[in-house]
Curated annotation (Swiss-Prot):
InterPro entries assigned: HMG_box_dom (IPR009071), HMG_box_dom_sf (IPR036910), SRY-related_HMG-box_TF-like (IPR050140)
DNA-binding region ranges: 1-69
One Gene Ontology cellular component: nucleus
Claim: Nucleus is one of the keywords in the record: yes
Location within or outside the cell: Nucleus
Record's protein name: SRY-related protein AES6
Organism this protein belongs to: Alligator mississippiensis (American alligator)
One GO biological process term: brain development
Keywords: DNA-binding, Nucleus
Length: 72
């Protein structure tokens, strides 16, 4: 069972197609670096919808898998 996405991952998933459209030849490592930089530059107020979405995912995950323990 996968862990629920955090706020950054929710935001990153929503942006996935945009970066690929702009730079289809860019490597995943570079895309990840750019997403990380953009996330850090976002205002806290702009992050709120993604934080709330991540919290909803976390609560649903807890309900769906009550005995889940993260084991890397």
């Amino acid at each position: 069972v996968k862990r629920p996405m955090n706020a950054f991952m929710v935001w990153s998933q929503s942006r996935a197609g945009k970066i690929m459209e702009q730079s289809p030849d860019m490597h995943n490592a570079e895309i990840s670096k750019r997403r990380g930089k953009r996330w850090k530059l976002l205002k806290d107020s702009d992050k709120i919808p993604f934080i709330r979405a991540a919290e909803r995912l976390r609560l649903k995950h807890m309900a769906d898998y009550p005995d889940y323990k993260y084991r890397p």
